[in-house]
Amino acid sequence: MAKKRKCGVLLPVSSLPSKYGIGCFDKKAYEFVDALKEAGQSYWQILPLGPTSYGDSPYQSFSTFAGNPYFISLEELIKEGVLTKKECESVDFGTDATSVDYAKLYEGRMILLRKAYERSNVYMDSEFRRFQEVKLIK
């Protein structure tokens, strides 16, 4: 039996539309996946998802296992109540919607993500603490 051919699209997550400087896994990503399905596509090929280092290339990451914090949805963090829309909109992510200003992104987004982490109280969660303990033991 012959295998059925399938097709897909290569689109870096960073290329998704966003008012916060870079595309991420938010509502726009879900809409893109829905559009792919509607168009009969089977695959969404994305570039590596690791954090970028100098040069901001997805192929030059300083971690094999970590995810890129730029792809965390600020809109979801607003919904969760750990950031406000005003805080996110007060950050300068650059003015060119067709390219990513990584210097501004690094400065602004990391401050917001730190605030969200501190407000989340995840470090007080017993399941998270058990996870940390298991990682320390191994």
Model-derived features: where do they sit?
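Acidic/aromatic-lined carbohydrate-recognition and catalytic surfaces
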Residues: 2-138
